[in-house]
């Protein structure tokens, strides 16, 4: 398969009097020919890459199949490109994966919808290879193509393909076939539908677990397209077979089928047909099956019916919370708030809370972390009084957990508790723990506390905040971790927005300015960052009297990093100075001279940032 990329011979025009001035139209034609030749050469290169020994080049070429097909034209794309691709099935898996993904995109380049079935041949072969990822992509692409077909093509081309795969000698083809039954089921007549149900049932009973796993995945979708009659006579029996399969890898997939069936049945039918299988799966001998039930429990409850949940499933959920496997308890802990919505307050207090108290002290840190992340969801359900009485002690205990993720998860959801019990009570109850966590050895915990502080500021008031939390906020500026120092500067800006610029001047800025004289250059650097970050929240007079002199004073610092950050800070300050008449003259009198001096600095980085800031400063015009 080749593309003719040889240059075309230009048409020669014979003229008696040839003007020495080039004809623009002729030049346009020449350029067009040249561009066309370049395009053909590019396509030829792509075709060569399809056969190249370098795997990555073959992958790249497969990603450009539509370009190749467009250049070849419909006939050659059908008769040459697709057969060539079909012959490439023995390639590396990464090439085949891209090929399986790109083949459906060729349908617009084949010359009409009647040629779409041509794409089935290579995809059928891809659906039978050993690599599961490639097979899954091929099945996805086959479903895509089937959706583009008319009913005649589905019956005459697609259905025979599925039958061949379903009856294939190798389990790989049979596993792929399972995922193709639902896509065209409704387009078939009753006789063909019955044939497909029988074929699918054979796959459900296949001797190979991998095939049965595929049918378990596919039955969920098939349950959504069969008639009500066949849901009862066909889907439910197959579900029960799979739910009692001897392989746990098959059984764990059936919870999704149960949900799909429950969505189509009424509450009474769900009670009669699905309740016992659900309970059986929830106490399955394999922990992976119980884990799947626990992780989907709220979704099951949403579909199976509220009355059934309250009457039949409370104890089932409690058993999952007490499961002997940590992974199951972790999954169940994540479902606590969602399941609690189906239960009354008495049930929560009598049945769930004892389990939750045990989980707070669970030996598995992941269980405690999952509980910490979701326990706050009980607050809106229990209300203020019961939250204070029953949940606050558990929050405090989790805040003191030795595992940092547990502490982080509680902090991340304090806002939900705050909405129920109010910030005053929350701060009084949790402030000692918050103060302790502010010095936590894990920097991520300290970061979470910093980000929560502004939410406490307004409700606590200035006096309480200054007395209990101000020193803490200032101490973070000297933290050994950069992310903490950065968050601390943003925190001070937010606090200034809450308490006002005068508060910042009297309490914060004076302490920041003292850091400019610290022997440790990191403190001096933090001074620049903090003042620059806070600028937007400060008044022009404070910038003029405190911020600018401090920044200018550091322009002669012996550390180059300090000096070029001074230049960057002055660049940031310039717009703020320009906005007010009382400070606009400082640009020419103070900022520009300082920057001019820095442009002659011996350090290249300092000169660069100073020059950039100087250009910006000189462009600024005082506002009138």
Map each language-model feature to its residues.
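Extended, low-complexity, acidic/polar intrinsically disordered regions
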Residues: 1-624
């Amino acid at each position: 398969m080749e593309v003719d990329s040889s240059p075309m011979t230009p048409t020669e025009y014979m003229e008696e009097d040839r003007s020495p001035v080039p004809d623009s139209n002729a030049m346009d034609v020449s350029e067009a020919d040249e561009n066309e030749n370049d395009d053909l050469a590019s396509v030829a290169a792509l075709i060569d890459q399809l056969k190249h020994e370098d795997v990555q080049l073959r992958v790249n070429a497969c990603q450009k199949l539509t370009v190749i097909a467009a250049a070849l034209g419909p006939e050659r794309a059908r008769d040459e490109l697709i057969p060539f691709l079909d012959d490439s099935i023995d390639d590396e898996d990464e090439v085949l994966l891209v090929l399986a993904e790109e083949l459906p995109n060729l349908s617009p380049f084949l010359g009409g919808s009647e040629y779409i079935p041509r794409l089935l041949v290579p995809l059928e072969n891809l659906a039978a290879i050993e690599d599961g990822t490639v097979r899954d992509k091929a099945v996805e692409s086959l479903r895509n193509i089937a959706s583009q077909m008319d009913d005649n093509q589905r019956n005459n081309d697609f259905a025979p393909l599925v039958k061949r795969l379903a009856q294939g000698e190798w389990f790989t083809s049979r596993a792929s076939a399972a995922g193709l039954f639902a896509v065209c089921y409704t387009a078939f007549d009753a006789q063909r539908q019955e044939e497909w149900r029988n074929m699918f049932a054979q796959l459900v009973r296949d001797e190979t677990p991998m095939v049965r796993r595929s049918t378990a995945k596919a039955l969920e979708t098939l349950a959504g397209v069969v008639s009500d009659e066949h849901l009862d006579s066909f889907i439910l029996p197959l579900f029960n077979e799979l739910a009692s399969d001897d392989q746990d890898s098959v059984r764990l997939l059936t919870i999704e089928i149960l949900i799909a069936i429950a969505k189509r049945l009424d509450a009474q039918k769900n009670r009669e047909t699905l309740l016992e299988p659900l309970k059986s799966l929830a106490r399955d001998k394999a922990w992976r099956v119980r884990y799947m039930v626990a992780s989907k429990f709220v979704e099951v409850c949403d579909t199976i019916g509220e009355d059934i949940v309250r009457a039949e499933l409370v104890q089932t959920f409690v058993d999952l919370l007490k499961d002997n496997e940590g992974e199951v308890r972790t999954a169940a802990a994540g479902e606590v708030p969602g399941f609690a919505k189906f239960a009354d307050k008495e049930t929560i207090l009598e049945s769930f809370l004892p389990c939750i108290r045990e989980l707070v002290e669970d030996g598995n840190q992941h269980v405690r972390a999952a509980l910490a992340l979701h326990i706050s969801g009980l607050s809106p359900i229990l209300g203020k009084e019961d939250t204070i009485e029953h949940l606050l002690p558990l929050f405090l205990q989790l805040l003191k957990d030795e595992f940092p993720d547990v502490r982080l998860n509680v902090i991340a959801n304090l806002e939900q508790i705050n909405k129920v019990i109010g910030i005053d009570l929350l701060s009084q109850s949790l402030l000692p723990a918050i103060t302790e966590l502010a010095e936590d050895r894990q920097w991520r915990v300290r970061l979470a506390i910093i980000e929560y502080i502004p939410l406490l500021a307004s409700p606590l008031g200035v006096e309480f905040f200054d007395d209990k939390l101000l020193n803490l906020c200032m101490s973070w500026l000297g933290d050994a971790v950069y992310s903490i120092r950065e968050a601390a500067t943003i925190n001070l800006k937010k606090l200034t927005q809450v308490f006002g610029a005068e508060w910042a001047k009297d309490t914060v800025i004076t302490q920041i300015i003292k850091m400019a004289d610290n022997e440790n250059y990191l403190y001096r650097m933090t001074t620049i960052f903090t003042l620059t970050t806070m600028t937007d929240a400060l008044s022009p007079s404070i910038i003029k009297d405190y911020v600018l002199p401090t920044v200018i004073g550091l322009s002669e610092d012996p550390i180059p990093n300090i000096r070029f950050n001074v230049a960057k800070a002055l660049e940031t300050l310039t717009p703020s100075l320009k906005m007010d008449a009382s400070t606009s003259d400082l640009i020419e009198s103070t900022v520009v001279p300082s920057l001019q001096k820095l442009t002659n600095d011996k350090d290249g980085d300092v000169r660069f940032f100073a020059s950039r800031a100087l250009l910006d400063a000189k462009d600024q015009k005082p506002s009138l």
